[in-house]
Regions:
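Bacterial N-terminal signal peptides that target proteins for export
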Residues: 1-8
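C-terminal motif of bacterial Sec signal peptides marking the signal peptidase cleavage site
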Residues: 15-18
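Active-site-proximal helix/loop segments of hydrolytic enzymes
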Residues: 199-375
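Primary recognition of N-terminal secretory signal peptides and signal-anchoring hydrophobic helices
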Residues: 22-200, 207, 212-215, 219
């Protein structure tokens, strides 16, 4: 993983202006194709050839408190804009958006540049999708390039990463705030299994959500859980549940696995990949770049939320930073009509992290960290 901590320290002195490897089969894969049809945009550059895959059997168990109806075939009312396919000079973009100018940080073969504003510092490396925002790892859609001694960045990254982070002030609801917490898995869907004693992920995610709920309520949030017991619920129904309750934010809680590899560790936070951008992780599913889902209307807000939560958990736990990531296969995020993220709070396949996750005090620490990230 890209860890340019020393680069960040160098950058701050400039005074600039203004999951992992594949888990056990089916660990977090969608239970079935989403109950809607994604809207195809008009521009279709040829993406990489995606591997063939087979979806697991469909599971569709209704929540006991609400009757679910399928989403309409088309959920995006207006046609989204065509994906950006151009590259732009980062210096010209900085002038146009009144940020600090990009500055080179190193003369080594790994050439990195920093660009900052009053909101923070973004560091990119030429030829790499790895980047950092205020010291927290992230992943670009496309690797920046050097052309005639200038840094060029893909237009999708400028629109979906640079602008939301460097130029836009994060906004969260201040009144009548509703947040839906989604404890991953449940019922016959255990999730991943602890390498220590075989305890299922579903038990730990539910406990995490139960600990988090009163902390958010104390801050004025109305908190609704997609499940409050060991109940099975299809990922598409979790999205429908959130929409039915008019959620302002949606946070799905999970733990990770790289079994049989026991070495992988750390924290990842996901939001859905913007239309027209390749994902950070696909887990073998086709990465259909040019499909548009309801939650893509909140790309900027989801990214900002992901960084708030991710940074807060890192600071509280000292976990390895695996970064804020983008994925398109996460069905629980696709149908959301509000900013939405999925947190992978550690690896149950790693003995050391599994030991922490099984400790109630550590799960309380995770809950406190998520609550601290929200106003």
């Amino acid at each position: 993983m890209f860890r340019p901590v020393s680069l960040l320290l160098a950058c701050l002195a400039l005074g600039l202006a203004g999951c992992a490897t594949a888990p056990p089969e089916g660990a977090h894969a969608p239970n079935a194709p989403p109950a809607w049809t994604a809207t195809n945009t008009v521009a279709r550059p040829t993406p990489p050839v995606a591997p063939k895959y087979t979806l697991p059997p469909s599971t569709n168990v209704n929540h006991p408190a609400i009757q679910f109806n399928p989403l309409p075939a088309t959920v995006v009312k207006s046609t989204p804009p065509a994906p950006v396919t151009t590259w732009s000079s980062l210096s010209r973009w900085a002038v146009a958006h009144q940020t600090g100018m990009p500055h080179r940080l190193t003369t080594s073969p790994v050439v990195s540049y920093a660009i900052g504003s009053s909101r923070g510092v973004l560091i990119v490396t030429i030829g790499s999708r790895d980047a950092t925002w205020n010291g927290t790892a992230m992943h670009l859609g496309f690797a920046p390039e050097m052309v005639d001694d200038q840094v060029f960045v893909h237009g999708m990254d400028l629109a979906k990463n640079f602008e939301p982070l460097l130029c836009e002030t994060p906004s969260l609801p201040k009144t009548n705030r509703i947040i839906v917490l989604d404890p991953g898995h449940g019922g016959r869907e255990p999730g991943t299994i602890s390498v220590l004693d075989g305890q299922p992920e579903k038990t730990f995610t539910l406990d995490w959500a139960r600990r988090l709920a009163p902390l958010l309520e104390a801050k004025g949030w109305r908190v609704i859980l997609t499940r409050t017991n060991d109940t099975e619920m299809a990922v598409t129904n979790r999205a429908i549940f959130s929409v039915a309750h008019h959620a302002d934010l949606f946070i799905s809680l999970h733990f990770n696995s790289s079994a049989p590899d026991r070495k992988q560790s750390g924290l990842e936070t996901y939001c859905l990949t913007p239309t027209g951008m390749p994902s950070t992780l696909t887990r073998g599913y086709p990465d259909l770049w040019y499909q548009n889902y309801p939650v893509n209307a909140f790309d900027a807000e989801s990214l900002q939320l992901a960084f708030r939560v991710h940074h807060s958990i890192l600071r509280a736990t000292g976990a390895e930073d695996r970064g804020v990531c983008r994925a398109r296969f996460m069905g629980v995020l696709r149908g959301q009509r509000c900013p939405a993220v999925l947190i992978e709070g550690g690896y149950l396949s790693n003995p050391n992290e599994a030991r922490l996750i099984e400790n109630a005090a550590y799960r309380q620490k995770l809950a406190v960290a998520v609550a601290a990230a929200l106003p």
